[in-house]
Amino acid sequence: MTIQQPARQTTDLAMFGGDRSVPRELGIRPWPMVTGQDEQAVHRVLRSGRFTSASSGEQEIAGLEREWARFVGTEHCVAVSNGTAALSVALGAAGVEPGDEVIVPALSFIGSATAPLHLMAVPVFVDIDPVTFNLDPAALEAAITSRTKAIVVVHLHGLPADMDRITEIAARHGITVVEDAAQAHGARYRGRSVGSIGAVNTFSLNVSKNLATCGEGGLITTDDADVATRALMLRQFGELIPARGERSYVAHLLGWNCKPNAIQAAFTRSRLTQLPAEMAVREENVGRLLGRLAAYPGFLVPQVPQDRTHAWHILRIRVEPAAFGLADELAGPLRSVLQRALRAEGVPAVPYQLQPLPAQRVFTGRRGFGGYPWALPGVVDRPYRPGDFPATLRVLDDSFTIQKAHLHPDSGPLLDRYADAFEKVWLNREALAAIAATTDYTPHWERASEIADTEWAGAFDAR
């Protein structure tokens, strides 16, 4: 791979009055990109007049399900209205019931942990591997109890988790593995697509995702016909609705109404045909950026084990205090200062999650269904303490992310300018380290805002 050399520029930081590394006219390209093919797919549905259907055989939705199952390599796929619904339906289809425990990594999007709550199951958190940012298999076994029913394995930012070790532990204890591949479309683990390894698996089609629809959407994959049938029932009122024939309106299960619509399905089908080419270009663009960043020892770029591929949904960059002449305990202040410097240069360096999931108030305050599921008979009400997850805390403190800017195939020139910005920041490391050493700093999770119940009133009108 050819590494593009940085453009000639002043070494004065923008935060000190210098020129930006990233020209303002070189903005982030809209995502998802919408091609003429995508527009034609949507127009096809509009002309048909079939926007949704009670039938499980609706053409666009069923077509998306077939095509995604083929892409991932599973026997079955069930489409739903969003990624969080996909996870709730998948857990329900896997047999998770009230009072069961579901293991979730301490670092993920909130939906990974609230999905079990909607089934009255108890989320149990496990720390992450600080290199892959995924659930740490070494910490997994200690979290398993006789009540553990499932493990939600998140492929965070697009990198597959260590599935061999996780599935071996799960099989030994008779626990169901559910892949949360919301950020990992197209990523592979030892030659297999993510979403084909667990017993039942989920994807998100939110507009921010690598495979995006025009709004929200979710996909569930499995090789188990019974699980797929149960997912279909949970998707639509608990009914077993035939592809053809009359609807009986008999609810066999307590289900939801989370079926997608045909317009979003058609748009996603079109986007899917373009996904492999976009993945290849993204790999090239991101590889060039990370290749340049790797030359600066103060920035730790994502590591990809040789047995897997990365979808590059989010780029998480850690900082190394020692390379700036600082002690480890100054990682947080250093990250904060570097983040500000990069943003001044035009790089959208932002956090992803401000606190570990177990620090979220919905868990610490037991804000489920009137204190349930924690108050169910026989449930062990474990404390949720951020300090129990040191790797997660460290990663949140010493890293920032780049999101969305790199997804568009034409983002290469923009990412080259981002690399210029990182170089300029590195060249000014002594000045930035001096600022970090005297910065008054409090970690995100200690200052995350908490809205008192009395402050909720009027929040809608204040938007």
Describe the residue ranges of each PLM region.
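Phosphate-binding glycine-rich loop
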Residues: 50-101, 115-119, 125-127, 192
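PLP-dependent enzyme catalytic core of the Aspartate aminotransferase-like
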Residues: 2-3, 364-463
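Active-site region of PLP-dependent enzymes
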Residues: 184-190, 197-317
